[in-house]
Amino acid sequence: MRFSLTWGLGGMAATLVLLLMGSGILLKFVYEPTPVAAYDSVQTLIAGTPYGKMIRNLHYWCAHLVVAVMFLHMLRVFCTGAFLRPRRINWVVGLGMLVVVLGANFTGYLLPWDQLAYWAVTVSTGMLEYVPFIGAYLRETILSDGELGPRTLQLFYALHTAVLPVVLMALMAYHFWRIRKAKGLVVPRSPDSPVQENPDRAPVVPDLLLREAVTALVLIAVVLLLATLVDIPIGEPGNPGLSPNPTRAPWYFAGLQELLLHFHPVVAVFAIPLFVGFGLLAIPYLKYEADTGGIWFASRKGRKTAGAAAVTAIVATPLLILADTWFAGAGSPPGGLAPAFANGWLPTLVVLLAIGGYTTVIKIAFHATKNETVQSVFILLAISYAILTITGVWFRGEGMVLTLPW
């Protein structure tokens, strides 16, 4: 069995989840989930608990790595056509697990109760105001009198340590069962190979088990090395009266925060995530011309359209960010346009037209099939969001102004 079939990403994600739960249980022995004691309990964990600092470092690195690994796993599944029948439900389950992992990371981000955590969560919960109908109610439910307080911390602690882990473990068990029901992993094949009714499969024991065990051991060694050599600092205690500049959301929401700078808030916080979410759920249920399961990028032509999508995203996304930044800072909008339209809805219209134009060009220039077109647009949006995240994390300075990181 070739390692390049899956790159071990699913096994790595499962390993990181188990490490997170094990280290999280140990952290619970010291942590106190109250605004008065939370920060001091983390300080005690770092300075006064044997191996406490290393366990906290381990938990931190696993939490951030699992988000990246699960995102890469989703890309691998998509690019090898492993979301088609009979694996359609498992694609939906995988998306659910990614959402739960993001929720677990977000709820855990607040628990140290330092300045970075306090204001990152403040910014993120502030985005809820722009969700129509239920946004204000959700924000009031989470916050205590309009700001983070005891109720917020207790809610996040309960979700982080009890509710979300149980949901994640249930989804993982169902995910693995669905893989078995689908008769294992998707069988790799070349673009010219026909679909085999009864392909030769490698046994789980010892082939798959041995490969995944080796991958897990290497990953554990890397994470332990990071936990030993790279300490995770803790800042000053959270202060509601003193916000840092810039105030950033956690890195996995930095792309969403970047969107807020370029689109109308309702579009950035509600419409785009809703559209992308429904699009991801619908992907396996679209009617495609052929079964491309096991073929990287669907076909040889699909590899070209995927490359075109990557190049387009890498070139166009930074240019659009720069253009919108210049346009927003140029003063009053031209043509008497309302500022809310010029700085919010107009970029939305431009992006929609650009995506529509790109889709048309791909179909005409490459004679792309539906599968190749969907794949190309998916890669275009995924890389664009990655660039938005990089911009939000490293290229935003004081006042969220574009700046160089060095």
Residue ranges and their predicted role:
Residues 136-140, 253-262, 266-267:
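Periplasmic/ER-lumenal interhelical loops and adjacent helix-loop junctions
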